[in-house]
C-alpha cells in the first residue's frame, strides 16, 4: 500500500477574506458591494441620529436666519429633521475639512450632505449586492431590477432635484414634517399633481397595493387544506414542498366571474411578473418626473383655459389649484421672498396715483 501525502496550500489573509466575503454559506451575505455598503450605511445612520437629536440650527436659506431641526432645540419626532445644507453652499461639496471650524460646518448644514451622500452610496451598493447574491445563487436578476425603483426615487429627491435647482438646500429634509414641506413646495413650484409621470406613479403605487391585497386574499381564500378542522391551515404547508399550496384554478374561476374572464391570470408566472412590474414601472415614472421637474419641465398649467363669449375667464378647479400653489409659494421662504416669482415677475404697480407733496 502506498500513501500519498500532499501539503495543504496555505491561503493568504486576502484569499481568506475574499472567500469569506463571497461565501453564500454565511448567515449574512456580505459580497464585494457589501464591503462598501456596510460602512457607508453605518456612517449615514450614526450621523443622522446624532444630527436629529443634537444638531444646532442651520441657515438653510442662506439669509442668516437659522432653522432648528433637532430634538434638543425644541422639536419633537414629528417636527424634527436634519435640515438641508445652506443655500450659501449651493452645489459645492461640503465635507468637514472644507469648513473653517466644526461650528461653521454645522451652521451651514454639513451633516445633511454627509448623511445623503453616504446613504445614496449605501443603497446603490445594496442594489449591487442583491445582483451579486442572485448571480452567485444562479437566480435571475429581477430582484435588483425591482429595487432600482425606490433607489431611483431616492436619487431623484436627494441628488438630481438639488442639482437641477442649483442648491442642496432644495433637497428633501430628513424628517416627517420636512418631507411634507418638500411636497407642498414642490407642488407650488412645479404643479406636480398635473404632471403625467406623477399620475403614472400614483397609479403604480395604489394599483400595486390593490393588486397585492387582491392576490393575497385570493391565495388565502383558496388554500388547499392539509390539516384537520381543529388546526390552522398554515400548518399544512411544509417549507420546500413541491405541491401547490393553493388552488389557482379556483382563484382564477372566482375572480373571472367576479369581474370578467380575461381580468384573471391563468398563468402563475405571468401573474407574479405583473405584480412586480406594475408598481416598479410606476415608481420609475415618478422618479423620472421628479428628475425632469428638477430642470423646470413642470406639470400642465391650465390657467384660465376656459373663457366665455366675452373673453372672460370661467374658473375651473385647475384655477383653484393654481391659486393654492401661489398661496403655498408665498408662505415658502416668507422672509427671503415677499411674493412668489409669478407675481414678482410682473410690472410693478404704482402705490399712489400721483407724487406726494413732501413740502406740505
Curated annotation (Swiss-Prot):
Residues under site feature: Stabilizes free radical intermediate: 190
Residues reported to bind [CaMn4O5] cluster: 170, 189, 332-333, 342, 344
UniProt cross-references to PROSITE patterns, sorted A to Z: REACTION_CENTER
Keywords of this entry: Calcium, Cell inner membrane, Cell membrane, Chlorophyll, Chromophore, Electron transport, Herbicide resistance, Iron, Magnesium, Manganese, Membrane, Metal-binding, Oxidoreductase, Photosynthesis, Photosystem II, Transmembrane, Transmembrane helix, Transport
Bilayer topology term: Multi-pass membrane protein
Bilayer-spanning residue ranges: 29-46, 118-133, 142-156, 197-218, 274-288
Keyword Oxidoreductase attributed: yes
Top EC group: oxidoreductase
Main location: membrane
UniProt-annotated binding residues for Fe cation: 215, 272
An example Gene Ontology CC term for this record: plasma membrane
GO BP terms: photosynthetic electron transport in photosystem II; response to herbicide
Site (Cleavage): 344-345
Pfam families linked to this entry: Photo_RC
Binding site for a quinone: 215, 264-265
Subcellular location field: Cell inner membrane
Role noted for this protein: Photosystem II (PSII) is a light-driven water:plastoquinone oxidoreductase that uses light energy to abstract electrons from H(2)O, generating O(2) and a proton gradient subsequently used for ATP formation. It consists of a core antenna complex that captures photons, and an electron transfer chain that converts photonic excitation into a charge separation. The D1/D2 (PsbA/PsbD) reaction center heterodimer binds P680, the primary electron donor of PSII as well as several subsequent electron acceptors.
Family named by the database record: Belongs to the reaction center PufL/M/PsbA/D family.
NCBIfam families: psbA
Name listed for the protein in its UniProt record: Photosystem II protein D1 1
Organism: Gloeobacter violaceus (strain ATCC 29082 / PCC 7421)
